[in-house]
Amino acid sequence: MKFTRYFLICISIFLWISCGSDKDVKDILSKSDALLQSNPDSAFTLLESVEELDVLSDETFAAWCLANANVRDILFKEPLSTDYMLRAFNYFKNKGRINEQARIGMFLGHAYNASQQRDKAMNIYLVALDLADRSQ
């Protein structure tokens, strides 16, 4: 009985922390979006302040990747890792709008290109181009 109670308390605390983390990141995403055009360096700093990416929901993680990739592109910084971008691309492919799929595809192509995976970059760029054409 004690074990069950302890287990339920631990699960409750974990869920409370996880949900709080998503809410905090969503606030950061909102603030960085407001700063993007006028102050992209500040938007980048805000996005980079997110530390525990592995506890975020897939939706929040994908939104963070898209925002971070966008600001990195504006500031001419290295792309995020292909692992991050592929996870975000798969989320948007299944649950995102077509324009989000096209944008994340372009950024995934940038990540592949930066990691010297030219064939994968070219293939995903073609997919992103097709998605962008269909979104108009």
Placement of each model-derived feature along the sequence:
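N-terminal secretory signal peptides that target proteins for export/translocation
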Residues: 1-3
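A "functional boundary" signal
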Residues: 5-9, 16-136
